[in-house]
Curated annotation (Swiss-Prot):
Residues annotated to bind Cu(+) 3: C5, C20
Name assigned to this protein: Metallothionein
Miscellaneous comment text of the record: The absorption, luminescent, and stereo-optical properties of the copper MT are attributed to the metal-thiolate complex because they are not present in the apoprotein.
Binding annotation for Cu(+) 1: C3, C23
Organism encoding this protein: Agaricus bisporus (White button mushroom)
Binding-site list for Cu(+) 5: C11, C18
UniProt-annotated binding residues for Cu(+) 6: C13, C18
Amino acid sequence: GDCGCSGASSCTCASGQCTCSGCGK
């Protein structure tokens, strides 16, 4: 479950949209 975020603590993908919390992009 990676949404293009490096070191993301939480990634949620729904309806083609990805939300990452704690993302260390």
